[in-house]
Regions:
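Active-site-adjacent bridging/hinge elements
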Residues: 7-18, 37, 115-118, 202-215
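A glycine-rich, basic-preceded beta-loop-alpha segment at the flavin cofactor/substrate interface
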Residues: 124, 166-183, 190-221, 238-239
């Protein structure tokens, strides 16, 4: 559970339309300039950095899904992420694969129905589990393990998968938070170790082109870190 008041604050936040400021109107957004979103997250980070971590990855996830996911995935997830009704994560790092993503071992095995079964573990996942929203959309970097065909080694063999906490139809997916990471600060944000045990997911973009799609989200996250830093610096200066 997140700290008292976090869920109520987040529900009011997304229902008022704040996460969708710069998303396209056709996707449930407002179509406003991205600079307004930067100002918003600067203020929010200065007020409560831990809480602000939750929606901080939303726009990157929205852009990633919009530009790389299939039409079927967009129909199911794009508007939910654009409006902030569902939150999202960026699942890259593994215990043995930090800055060198070429060492990623998590696997996605294709299924006859077009889905994949994802198996592996990810660490340092911001917002990997929480009670702020009814669903969490995990974007997971892994290797596509097709029958009789091994993915290329290194970063060129990575694919991207969308793995929801709750599956269409309401069933809980086989993805769990094993533990919360110990940190020096930012305790209001759950940084999780996530385990995928035959979790159902779907390929985002082309096979073995996962980094291309994930960089859309990563670049947005980098801009978000700048906004957070500015907000924290501003409130430190004011006080």
């Amino acid at each position: 559970h997140t700290p008292e008041g976090f869920r109520d604050a987040y529900q009011a936040f997304w229902q008022a339309g704040w996460p969708s400021l710069s998303c396209a109107p056709d996707d449930g957004g407002q179509g406003l300039p991205a600079v307004l979103e930067c100002v918003l997250y600067e203020w929010l980070a200065g007020a409560n950095h831990g809480w602000t971590m939750a929606p901080g990855l939303l726009h990157g996830a929205y852009e990633c899904i919009k530009h790389h996911a299939s039409d079927a995935l967009k129909a199911q997830y794009l508007e939910k992420v654009a409006t902030g009704e569902w939150l999202a994560t960026m699942c890259l790092t593994e215990a043995h694969a930090g800055s060198d993503l070429g060492l990623v071992r998590t696997r996605g095995v294709p299924q006859p129905d077009g889905s994949v079964r994802v198996n592996g573990s990810k660490i340092f996942i911001s917002g990997g589990e929480h009670d702020l929203t009814d669903n969490i959309v995990h974007l997971v970097l892994a290797r596509l393990q097709e029958p009789g065909k091994e993915a290329p080694s290194g970063p060129k063999g990575l694919s991207l998968f969308l793995v929801p906490k709750i599956l269409p139809g309401g069933k809980r997916n086989a993805v769990v938070c094993e533990r919360i990471e110990e940190k020096m600060g930012l305790h209001g944000s759950p940084t999780c170790v996530m385990r995928f045990d035959d979790a159902t997911g779907w390929l985002v973009g082309e096979p073995n082109k996962g980094l291309n799609a994930m960089f859309v989200m990563m670049n947005a996250a980098r801009l978000g870190v700048g906004n957070q830093s500015l907000g924290l610096t501003e409130v430190a200066y004011q006080n």
